[in-house]
Amino acid sequence: DDDLDAHINDTLVAGDGLCDSEAVRFTVTNGPAAIQWLIDNGVPFTPEHDPAARYPYHLTREGGHNARRIIHADDATGRAVVDTLVAKVAQHPNITQRNDLTVVGLLQDNQGACRGAYGSDTNQQWHSLTARHTVLATGGASGLYRHTTTPAPSSGEGMMMAAELGARLMNLEFQQFHPTCLFDPEGPAFLISEAVRGEGGHLLNEVGERFMLALDKRAELAPRDVVARAIDAEIQRSTLGHVWLDIRHLGEKAICHHFPTILAHCASRGIDITQQAIPVVPAAHYSCGGVATNLQGATNVANLYAIGETACTGLHGANRMASNSLLECLVFARSCAQTLLAQGQEQFGQAASSSEFQPPARAAAAVLPKEVLSDIRQQMRTTMSQHVSIVRSAAGLSAALAHLKALLNSLEEINGALTAPEGKRLHQTLQLAILTVLAAQQRHESRGLHYSTDWPHQQPTAVASSLSINDLSEALEKNR
């Protein structure tokens, strides 16, 4: 049995007191229509073969949900949705795709309104893209960390583009980490599903002992944040840099039946999971914070909107419940689109010409040292992973802030760095990392995904964090 109120309650519980109840109810209430829109557009969801079932599609259950309510496309729902919609976009006569451009900033008029975006092409030339409305859907900030669950993660550049125009950034300190990502520093990210532990997988430390048994009565089946903190603690006290996820005891037949994708992928990386334990680490997985928006995706900057992981709608609070993020993307994107269509074009007047707003001039013949930029990025990721990840402390956050400021100064001292696309994006990434540290420093408690050894308990009242580009400027001016 399930209903909307049950889904709402599960979401509020997962958000640990910080959810916006209006955003939660809005998302859940509008969810069925959004799902039906996907079905109407041809997303191949897995059918339910039980003739007595109440719904024609198979529903599964994930962490935090107290009922089977998640529609899916086998074990690759996200890809099925994206592939279907990308094909629709390619066929649409009124949509122009510019895959040759990398957007690095937004255009703003004298009244402070957003008037489009600018980016560079493969020849490093700037292009202005003017628009009556601009919608950011640039992903989260998992790329701030050394280990992520996505092969090509964004690092919050879109969030900083919005902040540069004056948008508020909310709840940046709440970064979700998945407990088990394949540990392979030289290879692409690969998520090891929680189903592996659900089917009986054991987490082992450096000496081959199960460490979850002594920490939680649910052992490997404890909540995601509990398991991630336990793994992080083991890594900190060992020399491996990872722990082991062992399913050899399940037997080859069961492994082949339940985990064919994981079996094949690990084999391609030289690991036979029927004979070897899998090296795993917690990895940055989802950003609960982002650009603050209302129920239509609007930011506090006129004509600028944000959708998905780029945004912070208040739905997730201090911790995202599994699969709510994809639902959020759909519901808020539809709400945003319907709002813009309802407004019509008359009230916005003539669209600005591309000559009215220009990107910043690029320094002549600026050639950035790629090795130096790469080193700065790697140092940033190491610092964030060491001090601003699963377990935090006041001393660690202070150390992170000092190091990130030094990295930012190093980048700014490179001739032409801030007028070249690659330098501009790295600058945005470092700025967002600093803002994330500031948000974490402001939270004198442990709540949801933010766990502090100095503040292990919750404050009686949950308050969302909110920062702007001015807060960043003030922080950078200190100790200069």
Specify the residue positions occupied by each region the protein language model found:
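FAD/FMN-dependent oxidoreductases across multiple families
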Residues: P260-Y305
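Glycine- and aromatic-enriched mobile tails/lids
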Residues: W37, V43-A67, D109, L204-E220, ...
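Conserved redox-cofactor binding core of oxidoreductases
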Residues: I39-Q125, T130, A137, R146, ...
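A short alpha-helix-loop-beta-strand transition element characteristic
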Residues: L18-A23, I35-Y55, R168-N171, G241, ...
